[in-house]
From Swiss-Prot:
<dbReference type="InterPro" id="IPR053793">
    <property type="entry name" value="PB1-like"/>
</dbReference>
<keyword id="KW-0539">Nucleus</keyword>
<feature type="short sequence motif" description="EAR-like (transcriptional repression)">
    <location>
        <begin position="14"/>
        <end position="18"/>
    </location>
</feature>
<comment type="subunit">
    <text>Homodimers and heterodimers.</text>
</comment>
<keyword id="KW-0678">Repressor</keyword>
<dbReference type="GO" id="GO:0009733">
    <property type="term" value="P:response to auxin"/>
</dbReference>
<dbReference type="GO" id="GO:0009734">
    <property type="term" value="P:auxin-activated signaling pathway"/>
</dbReference>
<comment type="function">
    <text>Aux/IAA proteins are short-lived transcriptional factors that function as repressors of early auxin response genes at low auxin concentrations.</text>
</comment>
<keyword id="KW-0927">Auxin signaling pathway</keyword>
<comment type="similarity">
    <text>Belongs to the Aux/IAA family.</text>
</comment>
<dbReference type="GO" id="GO:0006355">
    <property type="term" value="P:regulation of DNA-templated transcription"/>
</dbReference>
<keyword id="KW-0804">Transcription</keyword>
<dbReference type="GO" id="GO:0005634">
    <property type="term" value="C:nucleus"/>
</dbReference>
<dbReference type="Pfam" id="PF02309">
    <property type="entry name" value="AUX_IAA"/>
</dbReference>
<feature type="compositionally biased region" description="Basic residues">
    <location>
        <begin position="24"/>
        <end position="33"/>
    </location>
</feature>
<dbReference type="InterPro" id="IPR033389">
    <property type="entry name" value="AUX/IAA_dom"/>
</dbReference>
<feature type="region of interest" description="Disordered">
    <location>
        <begin position="1"/>
        <end position="40"/>
    </location>
</feature>
């Protein structure tokens, strides 16, 4: 129950600390005795760097924010202002293909493994010309 002063204004507790300290306390669940949010409510972000052949810059993508490969490819098309990025399930269809480096350091085509396995093993991604990516395909 909130306590009120003589003028009817709700009294609040003032805490001092460095900037962001209250947010950190809230994330840890210590503020006001509230329990931390359940793990089912928290979705971890998993950022990886993405490069594209012919561009002088990198982008960072949270792969855990997407539900499947098609959403990821659409986002990459938007990021690099390109509409020629696609999955390598059909040859000659796309000018660019997306490959990723897994935990073992191997480069693999995006779409070759189940989505959950990709999210957990992707270390970085590269958008390369489709003709160069043909040798990486598991069904080539």
């Amino acid at each position: 129950m909130a306590s009120y002063g003589d003028d009817g204004v709700e009294l609040t507790e003032l805490t001092l600390g460095p900037p962001g300290a209250s947010a950190r306390r809230a994330r840890r669940g210590r503020k006001n005795g509230h329990p931390p949010p359940s793990s089912s409510m928290i979705q971890a972000a998993y950022f990886v760097k993405v490069s594209m052949d012919g561009t002088p810059y990198l982008r960072k993508v949270d792969v855990a924010a997407y539900g499947d490969y098609l959403e990821l490819v659409e986002a990459l098309n938007d990021m690099f202002y390109c509409s020629t990025i696609g999955l390598m399930d059909g040859y000659g269809e796309w000018e660019h293909a997306v490959v990723y480096e897994d935990g073992d350091g191997d480069w693999m085509l995006v779409g070759d493994v189940p989505w959950e396995m990709f999210v957990s093993s992707c270390k970085r991604m590269r958008v390369m010309r489709a003709c160069e990516a043909r040798g990486l395909s598991s069904n080539a």
